[in-house]
Amino acid sequence: MLKAVLETTIGSKSKRDLKDYLPTLRNINKLERWALLLADEDFSKETEKLKDELKSGNSLENILERAFTLSREAARRRLKERPYDVQIIAGLALHKGKIIEMKTGEGKTLSSVQAAYLNSLTGDGVIIVTVNDYLAERDSNWMKPVFDLLGVSVGVVLSNMDYELRKAQYAKDITYVTNNELGFDYLRDNMRYDLNEKSLRKFNYCIIDEIDSILIDEARTPLIISGPTEGNTNAYLEVNSLVSFLKECSKDPKTGDYPLEIDDLDGDYTVDEKAKRISFTAKGLNNLEQLLVSKGIISGSMYTDSNFNYVHYMTQALKAHLLFLKNREYIVGDSGVEIVDEFTGRVLTGRRYSDGLHQAIEAKEGVRVANENKTMATITFQNLFRMFDKISGMTGTADTEAKEFHKIYNLDVVVVPTNRLLARIDEDDTIYYTEEFKFNAITDEVYKTYKKGQPVLVGTVSIEKSEILSAMFKSRGIKHEVLNAKNHSREAFIIAEAGAKHAVTIATNMAGRGTDIKLGGNIEHRVRKKIGTNVSLEEFQEAVKNERENYLKDYNEVKSLGGLYVIGSERHESRRIDNQLRGRSGRQGDPGRSRFYVSLEDDLMRLFAGDNLRSLMGKLGMATGEPITHSLLTKSLINAQKRVEDRNFEIRKHLLEYDDVITKQRDFIYAQRNSILKDTAIKDRILVALEEYLSFLLEGTKSSTVSNVFLNEVNSIFAYMLESLGSIENISYLDLKAKLMQIAKANLDEKENLIGRDLFNGFLRYEYLKNIDFKFQEHLANLDSLREAVYLRSYANKNPITEYKEEGFSIFSELIKDIKVSTIRRVLQLKLDSNSSDFKSTKKSRNVKPIHKELSGIVINENKSASNVQVVRSSPKIGRNEPCYCGSGKKYKNCHGKS
């Protein structure tokens, strides 16, 4: 209430920010005459002057107005587009580290030019992040002529580039890159064995396009570099055949809930659709054990070490059959099971569900079941972007998530007014009891609109629903296009014609993000269809000029019909996604209309608002087949969405608390790696570490004589070198420590003299880094297991986060000690000769793959041609071909794995 009163009297924070930018905008407009008089060659000279001023101690704020004026004029000359005042305001907000909300078609891409140019003048680089390679390449090519005129360099990083090319692109003043590539490059850089192979430089300033998609929708999705491991894929096939033998517990037919008393549960498992969770009952576990034994899958108890994983396999199999449906969560394509993004409807190429869920779905669908993978490095987008000195972002829909942006990222949202008043009519939702009545009503509405000639865009939440509507449209003779994950290759063509007369388009949550739907169709696309692509730029421009009259005629005709009519076939969990769909209509002051059709059988209604709405509709006297439109019902729908959004926000905040623990530890490990990469005297580092460890072993020792415990530890490190130690009878700890240090120094000096200082330093660096990487990978697996373990402690009234932090710190302390000791052991015990290959090849190739994992279960494989991968979430297991844990350098199967 107080917030509403304050906004009424003094305006919202967003409005106050806009008001603050007006004096600067007026000054920029006054300077425009100065920029108009400049010759083209003067722009780069002015850029150099501004750079010199910054080097002399001037601030960005003092040169801001001239920089914005220069970049505005450069855009006018090279793009024939003069940024509107609202675009200049958007640029000012971006420079100030804000998130700008600009409606579709208002020119977000051009708005970023001024802020990017100004911040590039420091020489520390600007990164502009987009959601895919197409947009990164398109935007960099589109804006390059502007930046070229200004004398600043522009680069673009694409997924198929090697590290040398990436390094060159990141070195440019302004670099366009996707969020995935940026994250993977950060992780890869921190797995390098040579400083010169790092591609990134300092994280200075970042502008994130579609920031809500990256920092909200993708927030639960850590990036992961993974490597191969051995797994039991046959188990998923075995348990898949058992699904039909188990029965779900009965629910109360009135409430749809399970009995509260455990003894009243009559089945083998319960299903939680909201949390996507399967829980076995005691009876279910007994039945599962009997099934596994009777089918010959296991022998003996299910609760032994070798058999207990079958509970996990069976849980994932049930999830695959009951909670993850074909043509909704995934499709089966040429490359097997492919995940569909719930927010965009696009196929997430290369991504895989984690925890064995993807294997369970593959077994269910009868396709090849791929092996599992282990985590080698990981980071979330939340913590990746928080490393920048300054970040800002732009999107068409951010205001609904303003609270989360502020609380987690300390970013404020500025809603930039449209250049022209919005003419779209947003109607109240129309609500039906059943999905069948709703789809019939949508078909009737589309048929009526189609006959009139007005273009229609119908948004669906799944491929399955889009195909149902498509079949109904066909039966009514409605010509239409379907845009979903199955035919995404035709997206550009379909979107280009979606605003033409008589056009009807069914789209699955993907109404052309990054692409405008223009009334009357797309003139450039129309010309390309006529004259082809093998023509010169001059011929193309002439053809566009000749086609313009016909295009304007079509545009005005569609405009007179009411513009684009957007129909939502269902409310999404997030209001942002609904607003994105609405935003396809009413571009740049064009007329438009939008309406959502909802039924009580929709997922959102059924899970979060069904009972309340059903009661309200009954009170309003609604019959089963009748529609109802009422502001109370619309408000109830929005409240349901808010509840889901709040729940998802809490989940993301909770995940961030866990990830912050890993972040601090990762930062420490990466700092150690960087220090070692730069170190030219690693021998001294190892000797210091040895002395510290020996001192640690001596701490708290009261006896004056050497204990067996101390000797055993020393023996594990020095091994054969102890022959030169001589008698230790009656020797003190301090004297023994001094002798051991002499032996260690002599050992390392001898090896250094044998192969040379530089080569030996390189060898030590490689061994140290290899050990850090191997141990840290084990540590990540341990943290994963710890996280699952502490969750159960909430039942004992313990805070899982606190438990995770405390135990995480404890095992991290052990990790640091273990890294040092195992490295010392390895370099001391290894025998070198001048022909040894151990030090001649210190850059062994490692089979690693970047993947992208959602904590609720998604992974991504960046290498599209590589075999599918998965992240393991269990106790760490050493593969037969991995290096042995003892540090000998041998494979595990040839060392301690023999026994």
Curated annotation (Swiss-Prot):
Record-listed E.C. numbers: 7.4.2.8
SMART domains hit by this protein: SecA_DEAD, SecA_PP_bind
A single MF term (Gene Ontology): metal ion binding
Residues the entry annotates as binding ATP: 87, 105-109, 516
GO cellular component labels: cell envelope Sec protein transport complex; cytosol; plasma membrane
Keywords carried by this UniProt record: ATP-binding, Cell inner membrane, Cell membrane, Cytoplasm, Membrane, Metal-binding, Nucleotide-binding, Protein transport, Translocase, Translocation, Transport, Zinc
Cofactors: Zn(2+)
Binding site for Zn(2+): 884, 886, 895-896
CC cofactor note: May bind 1 zinc ion per subunit.
Location within or outside the cell: Cell inner membrane; Cytoplasm
Topological type in the membrane: Peripheral membrane protein
GO biological process: intracellular protein transmembrane transport; protein import; protein targeting; protein transport by the Sec complex
Catalytic activity: ATP + H2O + cellular proteinSide 1 = ADP + phosphate + cellular proteinSide 2
NCBIfam families assigned: PRK12904.1 (NF009538), secA (TIGR00963)
Oligomer status and interactors: Monomer and homodimer. Part of the essential Sec protein translocation apparatus which comprises SecA, SecYEG and auxiliary proteins SecDF. Other proteins may also be involved.
Summary of the function given for this chain in its UniProt record: Part of the Sec protein translocase complex. Interacts with the SecYEG preprotein conducting channel. Has a central role in coupling the hydrolysis of ATP to the transfer of proteins into and across the cell membrane, serving as an ATP-driven molecular motor driving the stepwise translocation of polypeptide chains across the membrane.
UniProt-listed PANTHER family: CHLOROPLAST PROTEIN-TRANSPORTING ATPASE, SECA INNER MEMBRANE COMPONENT OF SEC PROTEIN SECRETION SYSTEM
Family: Belongs to the SecA family.
Name the record gives this protein: Protein translocase subunit SecA
Organism annotation: Borreliella burgdorferi (strain ZS7) (Borrelia burgdorferi)
Primary gene name: secA
